[in-house]
């Protein structure tokens, strides 16, 4: 991707230089529709809107900078926007514009996809091992995301144990993944026991092996791994000072024994997994932090009463 960004950046900067020195001339009609009616201002705009953002994204991508994906998204969007301005406002047309629009859209989407697959996670968390990595699945999709929670692991763990339809929900978009039933804001004591082989995170009620994961392994208050034939959903709770670093990794791919269902599922994962998983992580964060605050307040009240 950095190579593509570099080529686009150099092309845009070369075009800007050509406009500025007069070696590129669109004619009086088009020049009059450039910013301030001046090719020089047009050159400045082209360099500022396309050339420099693409160059910055290229360098950030090449160096593996933390915000490289966001910069790539922005640069791709600006390129598409520039092409729209050329066609609609400046009314300058060339065969390169469709190609540049496609490149801009592809660059922007690539940045978005990589950002969404690693949302909140550090480079070490993305590259490092996770519980459940040893389980082999047909892997076509892999996402590692994370969130910092101002509550200890023992106050985050219960919210994971009770995930699923007919239980606490998924703390996400309840109309989509929980039949419209609001996800619980309380710890449900009836769903706190975890054992290898149990059905986990059921997506229907009553739970069914076809619509649930199975608990593949767990380490109490530290790790929880759910698995099924075509995927692994793993959670890691890492102590982080007084809080928790909650890391989640989803690996999934086609189950050719159910090809049609896998195809539909693959499309849904690509489109819907990120917004729902992000909301789920933030939902767990909110609930665990609220519980921690309530317990701290109750403890302070009890101490004051004594």
What are the roles of these predicted feature ranges?
Residues 1-124:
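Topology signature of small-to-medium multi-pass alpha-helical membrane proteins
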């Amino acid at each position: 991707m950095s190579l593509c960004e570099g080529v686009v950046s150099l092309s845009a900067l070369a075009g800007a230089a050509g406009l500025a020195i007069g070696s590129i001339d669109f004619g009086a009609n088009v020049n009059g529709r450039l910013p301030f009616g001046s090719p020089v201002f047009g050159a400045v705009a082209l360099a500022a809107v396309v050339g420099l953002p693409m160059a910055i994204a290229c360098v950030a991508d090449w160096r593996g900078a933390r915000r490289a994906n966001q910069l790539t998204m922005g640069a791709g969007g600006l390129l598409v926007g520039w092409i729209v301005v050329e066609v609609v406002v400046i009314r300058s047309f060339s065969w390169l514009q469709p190609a540049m629009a496609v490149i801009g859209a592809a660059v922007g989407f690539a940045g978005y996809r990589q950002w969404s697959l690693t949302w909140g996670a550090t480079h070490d968390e993305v590259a490092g091992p996770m519980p459940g990595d040893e389980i082999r699945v047909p892997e076509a999709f892999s996402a590692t995301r994370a969130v910092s929670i101002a509550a200890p692991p023992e106050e985050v763990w219960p919210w994971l144990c009770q995930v699923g339809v007919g239980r606490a929900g998924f703390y996400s978009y309840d109309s989509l993944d929980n039949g419209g039933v609001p996800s619980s804001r309380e710890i449900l004591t009836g769903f706190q026991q975890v054992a290898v082989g149990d059905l986990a995170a059921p997506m229907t009620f009553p739970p069914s092996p076809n619509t649930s994961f199975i608990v593949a392994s767990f380490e109490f208050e530290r790790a929880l791994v759910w698995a099924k034939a075509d995927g692994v959903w793993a959670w890691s709770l890492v102590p982080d000072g007084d809080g928790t670093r909650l890391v989640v990794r989803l690996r999934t791919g086609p189950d050719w024994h159910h090809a049609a269902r896998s195809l539909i599922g693959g499309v849904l994962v690509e489109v819907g997994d990120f917004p729902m998983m992000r909301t789920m992580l933030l939902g767990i964060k909110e609930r665990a932090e609220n519980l921690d605050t309530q317990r701290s307040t109750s403890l302070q009240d009890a101490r004051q009463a004594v």
